[in-house]
Amino acid sequence: MRKSFFGLCLALAVSASGAEIKIAFSDFTASQSPTNFHNALAGTGQPGDWKIVTDESPSAFTPLMPGTAPAARAVRRPVLAQLSQDPADEHFPMFIYDGQVFKDFKLTVPFKIVSGAAEQMAGVVFRFQNASNFYVLRASALGRKVRFYKVVNGIRSDPIGPALDIATNTWHTLAVQCLGNQITCWLDDKPLTATMNDSSFSAGKIGFWTKSDAVSYFGDTTIAFTPIIPPAQALVDSIMKKYPRILGLRIYLPDADGRLRVSASKNKSEIGMAGTDAESNSLTNGAVYYGHGKGTVDVDMPLTDRNGNPIAAVRVQLKSYMLGETRDMVLTRVRIIINEMQKQVLSKTDLME
């Protein structure tokens, strides 16, 4: 399905095994600066000038007939361009996608190196933390090579990759796949190196990269990924698998502004809902609350750390089995569930992303 996400045109598909996002620069008009991105810079100078321009895009090439070579059609489509031309050597403009954090994924990016006197480069950053910590895969037309490296606390590692001719003013494709600590890179569907292993960054954002005065274009970008399940939600999912008869299960945690909200739930549409005084008192004072409805009972209890200090509030909804069921009987049933949750939680960090 196609939707607008904070003004960014993208296509999102979800399957049982994962999801896919297409960042569709071709849906913009010339001179726009795509939203849901932010400018970043490693090194010196000013941030890059990232805008939409029109160009003969890679998707404008189609075969004349099956079995024949692709033929160029005079079709121009919007693409992302980095247009600043700062010749400083240590000048690395980046354009970071803020829509999501990715852990395990495959990123596929069409690119074209257009010009540059000092450098002619284009690349991608991934598992980006900030302008001092990220991975890079980049192609250099002047240097005739493709290189992978990492930046940790502003220090670049030794680059890895082969010597290759990279034609300018020609569309190519970079791809990178991350599975755990395994990283695999391609240029134009050909592997660049053996799969590499690095554990510096386990997840992060993706973005586009250039160097110095390089003017480079980027086409519609695809990210196939496994959605990240927050630890609190993973805990709820595991408890629901063990106790499938639970009618409702929520974990409440303070948000960035200190407001108590549903952080994880059996019903994911409840995530983000505000907590009540009952949950607030469970978290603050360790209080236990009990209530019943038609055929159901609801209990709020604290989830504690290894020292017994409340770190979250939990609401459990169960079916009321008999008319004579007492409050103590219900609390005993709920404590079995809470105790199972406690086995997986030693501190608040066990619930946080």
Residue ranges and their predicted role:
Residues 294-303:
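A short beta-strand signature within small-molecule sensing/ligand-binding domains used
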Residues 229-233, 319-353:
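Juxtadomain coupling helices with adjacent low-complexity linkers
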